[in-house]
Amino acid sequence: MTITLTENKRKSMEKLSIDGVISALAFDQRGALKRMMAQHQTKEPTVEQIEELKSLVSEELTPFASSILLDPEYGLPASRVRSEEAGLLLAYEKTGYDATTTSRLPDCLDVWSAKRIKEAGAEAVKFLLYYDIDGDQDVNEQKKAYIERIGSECRAEDIPFYLEILTYDEKIADNASPEFAKVKAHKVNEAMKVFSKERFGVDVLKVEVPVNMKFVEGFADGEILFTKEEAAQAFRDQEASTDLPYIYLSAGVSAKLFQDTLVFAAESGAKFNGVLCGRATWAGSVKVYIEEGPQAAREWLRTEGFKNIDELNKVLDKTASPWTEKM
């Protein structure tokens, strides 16, 4: 099935990609970034620090990315110093979720809308949804209705809608556990099937790889839960679960593991259309920024940060498929 795009959405998608491949830098982290910064200083990270670090990353690394994903809370200064060639996605969700309940309900930023995100110069709206396909069905209906609203907003504004799905299990506390690893492919691939339906108005899915590679033979240091063939099957099932373009998130893994995973995904038959890669690219700059200041962080981004993004781009050249084949 080929999906048709409006003229405006197509132009926006082209601005966000290079030759149909989305090699985007993700820096819409808020809660996670504050926690990373807090590891290296005793005082609470300030707004100025967060804005400055985001701006440094944007300025130094967007010349090598097709686009950057930022948040409207701390990322607007960073959006203004990005490379002229780079597209912009803005996050529409509040950071984090209520940990006192298993429902992880979505919530939009109070003073933002798809219209305002477009007015801020973004080529796309990104929204993050936590989803457990086997979870409370009333909760899931609420989530589906929420995504329908955002899809309708994006249609009305004629702006691409990137839906990020982070899966979980209401009964498993730790997503890094072997217990979750065993159900991850089911969680990821079934959620993709749901939100690929036309009613949700999603243009691109931003998703997890369907396997925790740390438990795959040849990748695992410890316990092996999956053979390479079983892992490859999970990627093939993922490819079959949607007609939409989909891109991978790096989920905080190391740059090397993420790159190796992309090669494995492509060899397995996943026709993914790029990445939105965050911490795997810039994580090391946080400590340097706090301990040695902005100039040292800039230097780190120009060397280590550049190396990470350059290596990732080379891997993408060999592994990613253009979204234009699907739309």
Swiss-Prot record:
Keywords: Lactose metabolism, Lyase. It catalyses: D-tagatofuranose 1,6-bisphosphate = D-glyceraldehyde 3-phosphate + dihydroxyacetone phosphate. Belongs to the aldolase LacD family. The keyword Metal-binding does not apply. The gene is lacD2. Transmembrane segments: none annotated. This is Tagatose 1,6-diphosphate aldolase 2. One of its GO terms (molecular function) is tagatose-bisphosphate aldolase activity. It is an enzyme of class 4 (lyase).
